[in-house]
Amino acid sequence: MEPSRRRMTRDMLLLIVTMAWLVTGDEGGIKQEERLFNLGKLEMFVDKLPHIPTLHGYHFVNGFLKPKSLHIGMFFKKWKFHRDLPATPVFAYGTSKRSATVPGPTIEAVYGVDTYVTWRNHLPLHHILPWDPTISPAIPKHGGIPTVVHLHGGIHEPTSDGNADSWFTAGFKETGSKWTKKTTHYVNKQQPGNMWYHDHAAGLTRVNLLAGLLGSYILRHSSVESPLRLPTGREFDRPLVIFDRSFRKDGSIYMNATGNNPTIHPQWQPEYFGDAIIVNGKAWPRLTVRRRKYRFRITNASNARFFRFFFSNGLDFIVVGSDSAYLAKPVSTKSVLLAPSEIVDVLVDFSKSTSKTAILANNAPYPYPSGDPVTEENSKVMKFIINYKSEVDTSIIPKKLIEYPPAHVSTSTRTRYIAMFEYVSSIDEPTHLYINGLPYNAPVTETPKIGTSEVWEVINLTEDNHPLHIHLGLFKVLEQTALVKSEEFIECMTKRNDAVKCEISKYARGNKTAVTVHERGWKNVFKMMPGHVTKILVRFSYIHSNESYSFDATQEPGYVYHCHILDHEDNMMMRPFAMVL
């Protein structure tokens, strides 16, 4: 594939800047490059895969399950990502500074039992990473680092959703315009599945996650899940939280401090990519496994990197869940493409291996889909060392999983067009990204009715693949259709910003790309192909019962939908929506 004009321009700009450093002796630039840690010098697979600590969002009182209140802090500390890398300054979640980890503790909740979490900000006055005030509306008057926690995939009241403007600083000294309370309430009445929690402060999400503010959340429902006889227990059912980072020689996280349009945004870059692949807080770890089935709940917690996972020895993934919901039946596949924020729930049967080891590998270009090929460092994820002894395995791969009530387009109440725009400067470098031609802080334009379904036709007018995440609602992907005469359509949309007036039906009639089999279940985020219209059916009720929510979803501050490439989300590629009765 020919490189895009944008990439060519970016490469040329990088060359010019590099030459300027050499000619002018720009010590700051040269020193910055010299301080980068050469990751090729790190030996892979020397650290064991860590067990992430677990916090239970429930407890037993006289033999009965009861709600529990958790207090989880955000702390500044040092973290060892690799045996031979100096300790790294990070922000970490935990019940204390000593116990705080990257990723944060896995919260386990039980269906029907409320969990309450008081998130406490213990972070210092100044950030450990460069951040761009031209894109961040979350700027406190008296210093400190704004934070707010979003439970990704959670179905709960707006005041507990982690709205980007509901931020707070250390000790709740300052709060955002939509902050309401110190304690979040997770009602846990949705379908069982996998979620993750992470920071969501306006304009700071990318740097706060890069610093380490993320963790897993699992909702269990024993009467529904136990009959499936999937692998269980701490050894055989494990979250894998995966992200990419680069480092300086002193161990600190490297993030480019110069924007691609520095006269507009001094620091903002359209995507962050690191070369070390981190799993559960360790770079390229190893895990010794037995010859039996394991369950891995894999979260892509990267800022912008897509992963296309596969095993070096050809082992299959048996996909049982996608994002926060089970599939109707298991799907076997040789590879899995995971966008930032997506979760895939898989079984791997190591008894099928013909080799003693297997590398979990990656071959997704970055940016996806037409960026650079992977390198030696970012093409390796982790290593499995497979025990030679066979053993009895009582877990199974069931023929069926969980069948939810069907979703029919005929039941939808309306169709909405959601257009993704990217705007560039005179040097053809991105300056900002809008949805429907509007910034995040423009008034609400989408007002779905509680208990209904809507068809959203997502029109990607950019050259990037954008993972679209919808808070509260879940959806099914119906079809993906290429645009014909796309430049003509983009020109009209840029002028009129109206898909109907631009006669979308004339252009959305190109080749159709089938939805991958294991992504045909209920999703809360999906990859929107560039130059395509992706039709989804969004459900605004519980999918397991089709019942209305158990809370008032019409409250302020409402919900949002956005691109989950964090650098895009922070630079306006997010829109609010409000539920109505």
Curated annotation (Swiss-Prot):
Residues 274-361 form the Plastocyanin-like domain. Cu cation 1 binds at residues 150, 469. It holds the Pfam family Cu-oxidase. GO terms for cellular component: endoplasmic reticulum membrane; Golgi apparatus; mitochondrion. One of its GO terms (biological process) is meristem maintenance. Residues 1-25 form the signal peptide. Glycans are attached at residues 256, 300, 460, 511, 546. The keyword Amino-acid biosynthesis does not apply. Multicopper oxidase that may be involved in copper homeostasis and oxidative stress response, and that is necessary for root growth inhibition by low phosphate conditions. Functions together with LPR1 and PDR2 in a common pathway that adjusts root meristem activity to phosphate availability. The gene is LPR2. This is Multicopper oxidase LPR2.
